[in-house]
From Swiss-Prot:
Organism lineage: Eukaryota, Metazoa, Ecdysozoa, Arthropoda, Hexapoda
Endpoints of the signal sequence: 1-25
GO cellular component, one term: extracellular region
Family: Belongs to the cecropin family.
One GO BP: defense response to Gram-positive bacterium
Cellular localisation: Secreted
Source species: Lonomia obliqua
Protein purpose: Cecropins have lytic and antibacterial activity against several Gram-positive and Gram-negative bacteria.
Protein name, per record: Defense protein 4
KW Cytoplasm (keyword) present: no
Keywords for this protein: Amidation, Antibiotic, Antimicrobial, Immunity, Innate immunity, Secreted, Signal
The organism's place on the tree of life at top rank: Eukaryota
Pfam families assigned to the protein according to its UniProt record, in alphabetical order: Cecropin
Keyword Cytoplasm: no
Length: 65
């Protein structure tokens, strides 16, 4: 199991190095912007699910002491 995780880490490091070496600065910034938008959209879409959890578990669990 340890050997497999080392191989995965090495492959991901190699692919990251290849990506950085082939991507221009503009492309990198566009990719970073896309990641930020996906994170924002994920947070927004998780809102209704969090509301359902709050309602189902009652007020004591989510209130601050």
């Amino acid at each position: 199991m340890y050997g497999m995780s080392v191989r995965i880490l090495m492959m991901s490091s190699l692919s990251a190095c290849m990506l950085v070496s082939t991507v221009t600065a503009w492309d990198f910034l566009k990719e970073l912007e896309g990641v930020g938008q996906r994170v924002r959209d994920s947070i927004i879409s998780a809102g209704p699910a969090i509301d359902v959890l709050k309602k189902s578990q009652g007020p004591r669990r989510w209130s601050r002491p």
